[in-house]
Amino acid sequence: MSLIKIHGHIGYDRFSEIDDASDRELFASVHAWADGLHGSAVMLDGDRVFGRLVSEHGVFSPFASVNVVGDDLRFWPHQYGHGPVPDHARRIAQSFGAGTYEILRRLRIGVVGCSGTGSVVVDQLARNCVGELVLVDPDHVEDKNLNRIVNSRKEDAQQRRLKVDLMAEAVEELGLGTLVSIYASSLASANAIRAIASCDVVFGCMDSVDGRHMLNRLATFYGLAYFDLGVKLEADGEGGVDQVCGTVHYLKPGGSSLYSRHVYSMEQVRAAGLMRTDPATYRELRREGYIKGVAEDRPAVIQLNSLIASMAVNELLARLHPFRLDPNGEYAVHTISLSHGIYDHHCDGEPCELLSRHVGRGDVRPLLDMPELSVEAAAA
């Protein structure tokens, strides 16, 4: 557990000598009662927040950044570096301001799933000059992926290249300064979870409901802004199409969740998790009618993936640099149906009863309070 003391200043953007003395006195007692990292923060009248860690010996270390994950996304780094904007970023600065460009350069963003929507998200984030990308995907490129994974080639499928390797190479070849870390595993890996937990923002580009549920849980435990992407293309079996649609969810810690928004049921999460961890038992229970089958290998096309990926990246930019006429709180869910000519958006719902009690818990044992991750953590 960590304790943060916070108070306000009017027009004084640093800690005072009185703050130094009171923090040393207070946190000497705090450290005696509770292990862990503890700190002190100041909120300015201009709405900015800064802070510092206070050691048990009264030594101060500034917070690298203070992040506020709400309807708007606010990031206040300890040091602002407003250097010259390079030529390749000038259009970004012209569109959203030099301040937004500086924030993008400092962001560490996770992308879980690097196939259809994920590959487009990675490409757009890199071209928007994000500071670092953390990519998670266990799969390799196949022929069936070539029509929807940006930057993939026939030889990548022939060589069975990992999708994360392909994405990392493409980003590095752009030469725009974005760093890339890759994890060729599912999210259900201790190393992948810790890497995503260290991000500021995460994009979920997965089909599996157990992966989406785990990522929503991770974002809750570690206080991350979470953008979830979903696409659906349903054929009618007779050469036509029943439905072409997609959704972008923005989820903030302590708000509603994918589960409470009825994106999936816990029965579906259980079935998907069982299919991943114990396929034989999954097939047996499905055959006996105890669980419903999990949809596999859904159809997808690059134009629908690109549309939904663009909506998601624009949603990030709208929350960093609010440009809409209406408040961001009215855009927790975007739904678009190309088959039915519908675009709609909704505000956040009630806090999720399942996840809200886990907000900000951070590192626990087992990771995310999920028994299946205890073995992973022990092996890591």
Feature map (PLM): residue ranges:
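Active-site-proximal loop/helix of nucleotide/amide-processing enzymes and allied scaffolds
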Residues: 2-60
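A short helix->loop->beta-strand "cap" motif at the edges of active sites that frequently abuts
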Residues: 36-37, 178, 222-224
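Internal hydrophobic alpha-helix adjacent to the cofactor/substrate pocket in enzyme cavities
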Residues: 306-325
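A structured beta-alpha segment of the ubiquitous adenosine-cofactor-binding alpha/beta core
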Residues: 164-200, 206-213
